[in-house]
Amino acid sequence: MTLPVNPVDNLAALIRCPSVTPAEGGALTALEKMLKLMGFSANRPVFSDDNTPDIENLYARKSGNGPHLMFAGHTDVVPPGDEKDWKHPPFAAAIEDGVMYGRGAVDMKGGIACFVAAVARHIEKHGNIKGSISFLITGDEEGPAVNGTVKLLEWAKQRGESWDASIVGEPTNPNALGDMIKIGRRGSLSGTITVHGVQGHAAYPHLAENPVRGIVTLVDSLLYPAFDEGTANFQASNLEVTTIDVGNKATNVIPNKATASFNIRFNDTWTAESLQAEIISRLERAARDNRLRQGRETPIKYELTWRERPSHVFLTHDEKLIGTLTASVEAVTGKRPELSTSGGTSDARFIKDYCPVVEFGLTGQTMHMVDERVALADLEGLTQIYERFIADFFG
């Protein structure tokens, strides 16, 4: 029996599966085959929810006496766009000059391929693991993230599963392998403000009520002053206005409604609830401030709706997990990785409610891009890091 010790072969098998969210595309089947060669038991639960596609997931475990390490990630990928723009077909796993091309090469089929290879090498060298390893893999990370990791964790918990630590194999390194380990993530909160006015002719503003004035005033209250100046482990919270729309194509008509959407990435100064309260307070003050209403006699009439479920800020403090991974990275790459909380959200935001979690994978320079690719040397390097980590974690 040949174990899946080669990360290049593993990744090629996964890339050749066109698993664009929500399609499984054969990727979980390919992964399950690799894991069963190593004695893992596997389950493939499918989760559903209103107004979202059904999603197939995978949970596989190889049990032993000792701590339980979870590797988490996703096999779904974003669409490749126009395939004619690619140097090589996005699902061909073509190799040229020591580089493999393909959608998901770094985000994040590459990380999965390397961890599989690392486990296989450990088993080949040492026999059974002194503990348990599980793979918690979803097909719903790049999509709504409703029928994926969040439900798979609860499904596993209900069946008696618990974990001592987790690694998420997202591409964490900005420039080179070994740059960065993610030990936490900022929270994320999104909302939409709608201001109602009275439609009218632009030449007769006294007969209308322009909602654009109101939306500008309210948005400005969220941009200034800054929410905070950052903390010891997190950069300053940052709000970005992502859309402003009046739905009006005529230049001589005052619209009757204006909307603005925003997203704020926030640090551990705030909880989602305290930040929502701060935003509401700012909007209320601005809506009622005579100095800001530009002659309006009544407060600005607006509605605030929260979009999506907020992601909560978190920071991992587990010294064994962080220290062991840091030492493994340094031993293989020769450099000490930065411990960071930068970047966007990931499924680690769900895992942190079950066990300590960190993120470490390949470099992210080409993720979601045309010609997404990974150096074969990086696949070998990451496999060696994971293999060393597994050996040291289980001692």
Curated annotation (Swiss-Prot):
InterPro entries referenced in this protein's UniProt entry, alphabetically: ArgE/DapE_CS, Bact_exopeptidase_dim_dom, DapE_proteobac, Peptidase_M20, Peptidase_M20_dimer, Peptidase_M20A
GO terms of molecular function: acetylornithine deacetylase activity; cobalt ion binding; succinyl-diaminopimelate desuccinylase activity; zinc ion binding
Disulfide bonds: none
UniProt: Zn(2+) 1 binding residues: 74, 107, 170
EC code(s) of this entry: 3.5.1.18
Binding-site list for Zn(2+) 2: 107, 142, 368
Cofactor(s) needed for function: Zn(2+); Co(2+)
Co-factor note (free text): Binds 2 Zn(2+) or Co(2+) ions per subunit.
Stored CDD domains: M20_DapE_proteobac
UniProt-annotated catalytic positions: 76, 141
UniProt signal peptide: none
A Pfam family reported for this protein in Swiss-Prot or TrEMBL: Peptidase_M20
Biological process terms in GO annotation: diaminopimelate biosynthetic process; L-arginine biosynthetic process; lysine biosynthetic process via diaminopimelate
SUPFAM superfamilies with a match to the protein in the record: Bacterial exopeptidase dimerisation domain, Zn-dependent exopeptidases
Keyword match Ion transport: no
Sorted UniProt keywords: Amino-acid biosynthesis, Cobalt, Diaminopimelate biosynthesis, Hydrolase, Lysine biosynthesis, Metal-binding, Zinc
Catalyzed chemical reaction(s): N-succinyl-(2S,6S)-2,6-diaminopimelate + H2O = (2S,6S)-2,6-diaminopimelate + succinate
Pathway stated in the Swiss-Prot or TrEMBL entry: Amino-acid biosynthesis; L-lysine biosynthesis via DAP pathway; LL-2,6-diaminopimelate from (S)-tetrahydrodipicolinate (succinylase route): step 3/3
Keyword Zinc on entry: yes
Role, per record: Catalyzes the hydrolysis of N-succinyl-L,L-diaminopimelic acid (SDAP), forming succinate and LL-2,6-diaminopimelate (DAP), an intermediate involved in the bacterial biosynthesis of lysine and meso-diaminopimelic acid, an essential component of bacterial cell walls.
Family: Belongs to the peptidase M20A family. DapE subfamily.
PANTHER family reported for this sequence: ACETYLORNITHINE DEACETYLASE, N-ACETYL-L-CITRULLINE DEACETYLASE
Subunit details: Homodimer.
Protein name: Succinyl-diaminopimelate desuccinylase
Organism: Brucella melitensis biotype 2 (strain ATCC 23457)
Gene from which this protein is expressed: dapE
